[in-house]
Amino acid sequence: MAVPYKAPVKDIIFGYEVIDSYNVLNKISAFSDFSEDIVVPTMEECAKFSEEVLAPINAIGDQQGATIQDGVVTMPEEFVDAYKKFAESGWASISLPSDIGGGGMPITLSGGTLEILSTANLAFGLAPGLSAGAISAINFHGNQEQKDKFLPKLVSGEWTGTMNLSEPQSGSDLGTITTK
């Protein structure tokens, strides 16, 4: 029988306190209201979601995994349902800039939530990071047409980002990787 997952909320909050993150971040105008009053309930809600929704489906990710058929990737239905709840709850965009529809919280806050999500279910927890990378690339380097087309769906969690490694001869060319 598996041991029930218990999110490390107290440890994460302790980490924020030890590095004095509230006072450090309060010096930045965008985070002047950042406090324990925001962090504690955020971590508690993330823990509740992770303990109740993500941890119970962790084994399914290992046992069933993702499949690809005719160019379409399919996840276990439990992962699809969990991701919908994740996106609807705003976890997908908690630290994204508010001017593109995100929560505008400091990335240190999403660091704590990502730790909770990932320790409950690593296969699930990896997805938000890939989306954040795609969102950042488009937001900082995309033209307005690309931003208008992709950012709303990525920020809302309707779409997810992917990892694309394709630089030939520069260390991330997956086609040339071999194993022993």
Segments predicted by a language model, with ranges:
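Amphipathic, small/basic residue-rich leader segments at the start of a protein or domain
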Residues: M1-L126, E145, K149
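Structured loops at beta-to-helix junctions and adjacent beta-edge loops in soluble globular domains
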Residues: I19, H141, S166-P168
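Glycine-rich, Trp-frequent "lid" loop and neighboring beta-strands that shape
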Residues: S95, G103, E145-K180
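Residue-level "edge-of-site" marker
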Residues: D99, L130, E167
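Short glycine/threonine-rich loop-to-helix capping motif typified by GTGT followed
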Residues: I107-T108, H141-G142, T176
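Contiguous, well-ordered alpha-helical segments that form the cores/surfaces of helical PPI scaffolds
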Residues: G111-E115, A132-N139, M163
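N-terminal glycine-rich flavin-associated loop
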Residues: L126-Q144, G171
